[in-house]
Protein backbone atom coordinates (compact mmCIF):
# COMPACT_ATOMS: atom_id res chain seq x y z
CA UNK A 1 0.00 0.00 0.00
CA UNK A 2 1.45 3.36 -1.05
CA UNK A 3 1.88 5.83 1.76
CA UNK A 4 1.36 3.27 4.53
CA UNK A 5 2.62 4.92 7.76
CA UNK A 6 2.36 1.64 9.70
CA UNK A 7 4.57 -0.63 7.58
CA UNK A 8 7.43 -2.11 9.61
CA UNK A 9 6.71 0.29 12.46
CA UNK A 10 6.69 -0.23 16.21
CA UNK A 11 3.38 0.48 17.97
CA UNK A 12 4.28 1.75 21.45
CA UNK A 13 1.91 4.64 22.22
CA UNK A 14 -1.26 5.95 20.62
CA UNK A 15 0.40 9.39 20.51
CA UNK A 16 3.04 8.06 18.11
CA UNK A 17 0.37 8.28 15.43
CA UNK A 18 -1.59 11.07 13.79
CA UNK A 19 -5.28 11.46 13.22
CA UNK A 20 -4.67 10.62 9.56
CA UNK A 21 -2.88 7.42 10.53
CA UNK A 22 -5.82 6.32 12.66
CA UNK A 23 -8.34 7.19 9.96
CA UNK A 24 -6.38 4.96 7.56
CA UNK A 25 -6.52 2.18 10.16
CA UNK A 26 -10.29 2.67 10.49
CA UNK A 27 -10.77 2.39 6.72
CA UNK A 28 -8.70 -0.77 6.64
CA UNK A 29 -10.65 -2.21 9.58
CA UNK A 30 -13.87 -1.61 7.65
CA UNK A 31 -12.74 -3.97 4.87
CA UNK A 32 -10.17 -6.29 6.45
CA UNK A 33 -12.54 -9.21 6.97
CA UNK A 34 -13.19 -9.37 3.23
CA UNK A 35 -9.43 -9.67 2.66
CA UNK A 36 -8.87 -12.41 5.22
CA UNK A 37 -9.66 -15.15 2.70
CA UNK A 38 -6.52 -14.30 0.74
CA UNK A 39 -4.42 -15.09 3.86
CA UNK A 40 -2.18 -11.99 3.63
CA UNK A 41 -0.04 -13.15 6.58
CA UNK A 42 0.50 -16.66 5.25
CA UNK A 43 3.97 -17.80 6.33
CA UNK A 44 4.33 -14.99 8.89
CA UNK A 45 4.95 -15.70 12.57
CA UNK A 46 3.95 -13.37 15.42
CA UNK A 47 5.44 -13.87 18.89
CA UNK A 48 3.00 -13.13 21.74
CA UNK A 49 5.19 -12.36 24.76
CA UNK A 50 2.72 -11.94 27.61
CA UNK A 51 4.67 -11.38 30.82
CA UNK A 52 1.47 -10.20 32.52
CA UNK A 53 -1.77 -12.21 32.70
CA UNK A 54 -4.20 -11.54 29.87
CA UNK A 55 -7.12 -13.30 28.30
CA UNK A 56 -8.92 -10.87 26.01
CA UNK A 57 -5.94 -9.05 24.53
CA UNK A 58 -3.98 -12.25 23.93
CA UNK A 59 -6.90 -14.10 22.36
CA UNK A 60 -7.79 -11.05 20.27
CA UNK A 61 -4.27 -10.85 18.81
CA UNK A 62 -4.08 -14.60 18.33
CA UNK A 63 -7.41 -14.66 16.52
CA UNK A 64 -6.45 -11.67 14.37
CA UNK A 65 -3.18 -13.24 13.23
CA UNK A 66 -4.71 -16.65 12.52
CA UNK A 67 -7.63 -15.20 10.56
CA UNK A 68 -5.06 -13.54 8.31
CA UNK A 69 -3.29 -16.86 7.76
CA UNK A 70 -0.36 -16.27 10.11
CA UNK A 71 0.79 -18.32 13.08
CA UNK A 72 1.74 -17.42 16.65
CA UNK A 73 4.39 -18.28 19.23
CA UNK A 74 3.15 -17.79 22.78
CA UNK A 75 5.12 -17.02 25.92
CA UNK A 76 2.79 -16.80 28.92
CA UNK A 77 2.00 -18.49 32.21
CA UNK A 78 4.85 -20.60 33.57
CA UNK A 79 7.10 -19.77 30.62
CA UNK A 80 6.73 -16.04 31.28
CA UNK A 81 7.26 -16.54 35.02
CA UNK A 82 10.52 -18.43 34.45
CA UNK A 83 11.73 -15.74 32.06
CA UNK A 84 10.81 -13.02 34.54
CA UNK A 85 12.76 -14.80 37.28
CA UNK A 86 15.85 -15.57 35.28
CA UNK A 87 16.51 -14.61 31.71
CA UNK A 88 17.25 -11.02 30.86
CA UNK A 89 14.38 -9.37 28.95
CA UNK A 90 16.79 -8.25 26.23
CA UNK A 91 17.90 -11.85 25.67
CA UNK A 92 14.29 -13.02 25.46
CA UNK A 93 13.39 -10.34 22.94
CA UNK A 94 16.51 -11.09 20.89
CA UNK A 95 15.53 -14.76 20.80
CA UNK A 96 11.96 -13.97 19.73
CA UNK A 97 13.26 -11.50 17.16
CA UNK A 98 15.13 -14.35 15.46
CA UNK A 99 12.03 -16.57 15.37
CA UNK A 100 9.21 -14.19 14.52
CA UNK A 101 8.25 -11.51 12.02
CA UNK A 102 6.70 -9.30 14.73
CA UNK A 103 6.46 -9.29 18.52
CA UNK A 104 3.48 -8.37 20.69
CA UNK A 105 4.56 -7.71 24.27
CA UNK A 106 2.56 -7.21 27.46
CA UNK A 107 4.46 -6.39 30.64
CA UNK A 108 3.76 -5.03 34.10
CA UNK A 109 6.67 -2.60 33.95
CA UNK A 110 6.24 0.78 32.29
CA UNK A 111 8.60 1.26 29.39
CA UNK A 112 9.05 -2.47 28.72
CA UNK A 113 7.55 -2.23 25.22
CA UNK A 114 9.78 0.70 24.27
CA UNK A 115 12.81 -1.19 25.57
CA UNK A 116 11.82 -4.26 23.56
CA UNK A 117 11.49 -2.10 20.45
CA UNK A 118 15.01 -0.78 20.98
CA UNK A 119 16.35 -4.34 21.18
CA UNK A 120 14.37 -5.95 18.35
CA UNK A 121 14.80 -5.41 14.64
CA UNK A 122 11.29 -6.66 13.86
CA UNK A 123 8.19 -4.55 14.67
CA UNK A 124 7.13 -4.52 18.32
CA UNK A 125 3.48 -3.95 19.25
CA UNK A 126 2.68 -2.89 22.79
CA UNK A 127 -0.09 -5.07 24.24
CA UNK A 128 -0.05 -3.01 27.46
CA UNK A 129 2.81 -1.97 29.73
CA UNK A 130 2.34 -0.98 33.35
CA UNK A 131 -0.10 1.85 33.83
CA UNK A 132 1.31 3.72 30.88
CA UNK A 133 0.21 2.69 27.40
CA UNK A 134 -2.22 0.33 25.68
CA UNK A 135 -2.27 1.68 22.12
CA UNK A 136 -4.18 -1.11 20.40
CA UNK A 137 -6.94 -0.86 23.02
CA UNK A 138 -7.22 2.86 22.28
CA UNK A 139 -7.32 2.14 18.56
CA UNK A 140 -10.20 -0.30 18.93
CA UNK A 141 -12.00 2.01 21.36
CA UNK A 142 -11.81 4.92 18.95
CA UNK A 143 -12.84 2.67 16.07
CA UNK A 144 -15.87 1.54 18.08
CA UNK A 145 -16.95 5.17 18.50
CA UNK A 146 -16.36 5.76 14.78
CA UNK A 147 -18.44 2.68 13.92
CA UNK A 148 -21.31 3.68 16.21
CA UNK A 149 -21.48 7.39 15.40
CA UNK A 150 -19.72 7.70 12.05
CA UNK A 151 -17.22 10.09 13.64
CA UNK A 152 -15.08 10.64 16.72
CA UNK A 153 -15.41 14.43 16.47
CA UNK A 154 -18.04 16.66 18.03
CA UNK A 155 -19.11 14.22 20.75
CA UNK A 156 -19.15 14.66 24.50
CA UNK A 157 -17.25 11.96 26.35
CA UNK A 158 -17.16 10.83 29.94
CA UNK A 159 -14.25 8.67 31.12
CA UNK A 160 -15.16 7.08 34.44
CA UNK A 161 -13.22 5.22 37.12
CA UNK A 162 -9.51 4.69 37.64
CA UNK A 163 -7.86 7.37 35.52
CA UNK A 164 -4.57 7.26 37.42
CA UNK A 165 -3.55 3.61 37.14
CA UNK A 166 -5.75 2.44 34.26
CA UNK A 167 -3.71 2.30 31.06
CA UNK A 168 -6.77 1.71 28.88
CA UNK A 169 -8.41 4.89 30.17
CA UNK A 170 -5.21 6.92 29.79
CA UNK A 171 -4.66 5.66 26.24
CA UNK A 172 -8.27 6.40 25.29
CA UNK A 173 -7.97 9.96 26.58
CA UNK A 174 -4.68 10.42 24.72
CA UNK A 175 -6.36 9.05 21.60
CA UNK A 176 -9.22 11.52 21.93
CA UNK A 177 -6.65 14.33 21.99
CA UNK A 178 -5.87 13.52 18.34
CA UNK A 179 -9.48 14.31 17.35
CA UNK A 180 -11.91 17.14 18.09
CA UNK A 181 -14.27 16.14 20.91
CA UNK A 182 -16.87 18.65 22.01
CA UNK A 183 -15.88 18.04 25.63
CA UNK A 184 -14.23 15.36 27.76
CA UNK A 185 -15.37 14.82 31.35
CA UNK A 186 -12.85 12.98 33.53
CA UNK A 187 -14.89 11.38 36.29
CA UNK A 188 -13.02 9.86 39.22
CA UNK A 189 -12.34 10.06 42.95
CA UNK A 190 -9.62 12.64 43.78
CA UNK A 191 -7.12 9.84 44.46
CA UNK A 192 -7.57 8.40 40.96
CA UNK A 193 -7.48 11.50 38.79
CA UNK A 194 -5.73 11.42 35.43
CA UNK A 195 -1.98 11.88 35.49
CA UNK A 196 -0.51 15.24 34.62
CA UNK A 197 0.99 14.12 31.29
CA UNK A 198 -2.44 12.96 30.12
CA UNK A 199 -4.02 16.31 30.99
CA UNK A 200 -1.16 18.13 29.29
CA UNK A 201 -1.86 16.23 26.07
CA UNK A 202 -5.46 17.50 26.11
CA UNK A 203 -4.32 21.03 26.89
CA UNK A 204 -1.63 21.01 24.20
CA UNK A 205 -4.19 20.12 21.55
CA UNK A 206 -6.89 22.44 22.86
CA UNK A 207 -9.35 19.72 23.87
CA UNK A 208 -11.78 21.07 26.49
CA UNK A 209 -12.01 18.90 29.60
CA UNK A 210 -13.38 19.03 33.13
CA UNK A 211 -12.48 16.89 36.13
CA UNK A 212 -15.54 15.91 38.20
CA UNK A 213 -16.38 13.41 40.92
CA UNK A 214 -20.12 12.79 40.43
CA UNK A 215 -21.29 10.96 37.32
CA UNK A 216 -24.86 12.18 37.75
CA UNK A 217 -23.72 15.79 37.36
CA UNK A 218 -22.66 15.26 33.73
CA UNK A 219 -24.35 12.04 32.58
CA UNK A 220 -27.11 13.85 30.71
CA UNK A 221 -24.57 15.59 28.46
CA UNK A 222 -22.68 12.49 27.38
CA UNK A 223 -22.71 10.76 24.01
CA UNK A 224 -20.13 8.18 25.12
CA UNK A 225 -19.46 6.89 28.63
CA UNK A 226 -16.17 4.99 28.89
CA UNK A 227 -16.14 2.97 32.11
CA UNK A 228 -13.07 1.35 33.69
CA UNK A 229 -12.58 -0.81 36.75
CA UNK A 230 -10.50 0.17 39.77
CA UNK A 231 -7.05 -1.34 39.13
CA UNK A 232 -6.55 -3.55 42.18
CA UNK A 233 -3.25 -4.95 40.90
CA UNK A 234 -1.72 -1.47 40.46
CA UNK A 235 -2.85 0.23 43.68
CA UNK A 236 0.03 -0.31 46.14
CA UNK A 237 -2.01 -0.11 49.36
CA UNK A 238 -4.78 -2.75 49.73
CA UNK A 239 -6.60 -0.45 52.16
CA UNK A 240 -6.73 2.26 49.52
CA UNK A 241 -8.19 -0.19 47.03
CA UNK A 242 -10.90 -1.28 49.47
CA UNK A 243 -11.81 2.35 50.15
CA UNK A 244 -12.11 3.08 46.42
CA UNK A 245 -13.72 -0.15 45.30
CA UNK A 246 -17.30 0.39 44.29
CA UNK A 247 -16.87 4.16 43.91
CA UNK A 248 -19.10 4.04 40.84
CA UNK A 249 -21.78 1.66 39.64
CA UNK A 250 -23.56 2.18 36.34
CA UNK A 251 -27.06 0.71 36.44
CA UNK A 252 -29.91 0.68 33.98
CA UNK A 253 -32.01 2.76 36.38
CA UNK A 254 -29.27 5.39 36.51
CA UNK A 255 -28.99 5.55 32.73
CA UNK A 256 -32.74 5.69 32.16
CA UNK A 257 -33.04 8.47 34.74
CA UNK A 258 -30.21 10.73 33.54
CA UNK A 259 -28.73 9.68 30.17
CA UNK A 260 -29.62 10.47 26.58
CA UNK A 261 -31.35 7.61 24.79
CA UNK A 262 -28.49 7.64 22.28
CA UNK A 263 -25.74 7.26 24.90
CA UNK A 264 -23.34 4.36 24.35
CA UNK A 265 -21.45 2.74 27.23
CA UNK A 266 -17.97 1.37 26.54
CA UNK A 267 -15.71 -0.71 28.78
CA UNK A 268 -12.31 -2.29 27.93
CA UNK A 269 -13.20 -5.33 30.07
CA UNK A 270 -12.94 -7.24 32.29
CA UNK A 271 -15.44 -5.58 34.59
CA UNK A 272 -15.88 -6.18 38.30
CA UNK A 273 -19.06 -4.50 39.55
CA UNK A 274 -18.85 -1.06 37.92
CA UNK A 275 -21.49 -1.90 35.27
CA UNK A 276 -24.58 -3.75 36.43
CA UNK A 277 -25.66 -6.75 34.35
CA UNK A 278 -28.98 -4.98 33.75
CA UNK A 279 -27.19 -2.74 31.23
CA UNK A 280 -26.10 -5.71 29.09
CA UNK A 281 -29.36 -6.07 27.19
CA UNK A 282 -30.13 -2.35 26.98
CA UNK A 283 -29.77 0.10 24.10
CA UNK A 284 -26.86 1.73 25.95
CA UNK A 285 -24.55 -1.31 25.90
CA UNK A 286 -21.68 -1.14 23.42
CA UNK A 287 -18.88 -2.96 25.28
CA UNK A 288 -19.57 -6.34 23.69
CA UNK A 289 -19.54 -4.67 20.26
CA UNK A 290 -16.28 -3.04 21.33
CA UNK A 291 -14.73 -6.44 22.16
CA UNK A 292 -15.88 -7.92 18.85
CA UNK A 293 -14.49 -5.01 16.84
CA UNK A 294 -11.16 -5.42 18.62
CA UNK A 295 -10.31 -8.44 16.49
CA UNK A 296 -11.10 -6.50 13.32
CA UNK A 297 -8.89 -3.56 14.34
CA UNK A 298 -5.99 -5.81 15.29
CA UNK A 299 -6.34 -7.67 11.99
CA UNK A 300 -6.10 -4.36 10.14
CA UNK A 301 -3.16 -3.21 12.26
CA UNK A 302 -1.14 -6.42 11.89
CA UNK A 303 -1.76 -6.44 8.14
CA UNK A 304 -0.62 -2.82 7.82
CA UNK A 305 2.47 -3.31 10.00
CA UNK A 306 3.60 -6.65 8.58
CA UNK A 307 2.53 -6.50 4.98
CA UNK A 308 1.38 -3.03 4.05
UniProtKB/Swiss-Prot annotation:
Transferase as UniProt keyword: yes
Instruction: Give an example GO biological process.
Output: amino acid metabolic process
Q: Which reaction does it catalyse?
A: carbamoyl phosphate + L-aspartate = N-carbamoyl-L-aspartate + phosphate + H(+)
Binding residues for carbamoyl phosphate = 56-57, 106, 134, 137, 269-270
Q: In which pathway does it act?
A: Pyrimidine metabolism; UMP biosynthesis via de novo pathway; (S)-dihydroorotate from bicarbonate: step 2/3
| Keywords per UniProt | Pyrimidine biosynthesis, Transferase
Q: Which family does it belong to?
A: Belongs to the aspartate/ornithine carbamoyltransferase superfamily. ATCase family.
Protein name as it appears in the record = Aspartate carbamoyltransferase catalytic subunit
List the gene name. pyrB
